[in-house]
Amino acid sequence: RWIFVARYEGNRTGEPVHFNSHIDVVETGHGWTTDPFGGEVRDGRVYGRGTCDMKGGLAASIVAAEAFLDLCPDFAGAVEISGTADEESGGYGGVAYLAEKGWFSPDRVQHVIIPEPLNKDRICLGHRGVWWAEIETHGRIAHGSMPFLGDSAIRHMGAVLEEMERVLYPLLEGKRTAMPVVPEGARSSTLNVNSIHGGEPEPEEGFTGFPSPCVADRCRIVIDRRFLIEE
């Protein structure tokens, strides 16, 4: 996957500004009434996967940079724009890669603007932290007609989820930040189960019927933990 960085140097020494947007998108999902990658314009709006999150932000950055250069050709510092991959799956091959290679070091960039879609008229000076993790339970496979011969990993995962509901979620909801975070729900620590998979894998083309009649010997969840600055 590609990463691009464009930089325009000013005429004098100053503090560079970097606009960063991610160019990857999540899965298209179902229920589209337009081609998700067609970019159809209707009633002044563009419809397509990623138009909001966040190709619109990238386009706005380019337009803003062009307008600034037209109005202030004799500016100090530099203007940078980057488009990075991998944001939707962790950022390790995108922003983290650029950071590791020194692209955001203080001698190169003093200000970073990320035009993520956070509703209108909302400017943020930071963001909650994130930690993604996997939990996997194991059991013993058996035929579905004789589950007593097996040990269901899905039932074990059910116990994990029940404990999260009983103990972990109330604990996290009790953690509150003193910062002016918006929306209100984001003032607490949060945890989401992003996905759960168990049993025999579905065909690559998607679910077409009942899965294999087996006791699941493995079950896996991916959790998404968001941290407050106080944590």
What are these regions (language model features)?
Residues R1-R49, D70-A76:
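Acidic/His- and Gly-rich active-site-bordering loop/insert found
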